[in-house]
Amino acid sequence: MLKLSIIIPVYNSSKILDKLVNEINLNLNETFKNDYEIILVNDFSKDDSWGTIKKISEKFDFIKGIDLAYNVGQHGAIFVGLKNSKGDRIIIMDDDLQHPPQSLISIYEQLDLFDACYTLYLKRKHVFWKIFVSTVNNFFSSFIFDKPFKIYTSSMKGIRGDVKDRFVGQNPKIPFIDSLILKEAKNITNIKVYHQERFEGKSNYDVKKLFILWFDMIENYHFYPLRFGSLIGFISFCVVKLFRIFYAKKSFSFEIKEKTF
């Protein structure tokens, strides 16, 4: 077993990946040597992200590339990465360099004391609507998933390998990573990190995708643990079904097109 696995969902980021991998390696190589892996999960990108991943994997032994057969979304791509990870500790981060590689060791060290560690961003570089939606999402997830109000869930986070092992075999219809972590992690902490400017391009998440994710969360986890009550749960379920008629997508599956390992 390796000391650390880093899971990165990739979508249309071919121009960023070289710099991202180099910065991660620069921050980890002295501490971990060859005892870590970076798993890059290509979520059916429209650019040459997969070609870039294959080139990087030929250069570095610690790179593992996974090419998905079709787009499953950020949480689905992360779930595939988790299923293929071998680290005793696992850190999940984005592909846009807004998550600072300099904070990876700090997150890793927190996992000696906690089951999960979420990052709390200082001076967030996201646009206002994304910050607002994220804040609302964190508020409601406290009710839905019994999350402590003082814990802020974010996309850069770390978990212990045994936490992953407890949920990775569940194969949910549509995985919502934070709900799975919150269910299995007994003690959780936050650490503050600096939020960097996006290195290239613009965010691949828009308002529609964020709302689809939120509705997926309600549709697939509204039973958890019946905190809305039967009436609110029924209304939410009906609204979600109507929304899905207009923004339907495939159920999540584990169809991998190609691997580099």
PLM region descriptions:
Residues 1-127, 243-246, 251-260:
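Structured catalytic core of nucleotide-sugar glycosyltransferases
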Residues 12, 16, 33, 169-173, ...:
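Alpha-helical structural elements of signaling/regulatory helical domains
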Residues 15, 176-261:
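Hydrophobic helical membrane-anchoring modules
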Residues 61, 114, 171, 185-186:
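Structural motif
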Residues 66-70, 74-84, 101-175, 196-215, ...:
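Acceptor/aglycone-binding surface of glycosyltransferases and processive sugar-polymer synthases
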